[in-house]
């Protein structure tokens, strides 16, 4: 696969993930729904999570901060999977988004997944 194709796939996935995180963050900032508030604990926690999702999106999109954005998005979604699992809620959607984030990271930053040793 050539570099141009990798970039197109990487940025397309970045746009999709950015859209998902932005929509979710804005939904949480607007108040969400009662079930979500009960699962998270309080309205304050929900607003904090919404702001966190928007910050992750802002870090994910630019090339210079994209690596940190990918790492933060991976960790955030892993936490979301754990919360859904403990609350006995379906985890298929969050696992799907987590897989998209990993694939996005692979196409945008293949060095994150290489087995080459970095010289000290």
Language-model region placement:
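Membrane-interface extramembranous regions
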Residues: 2-120
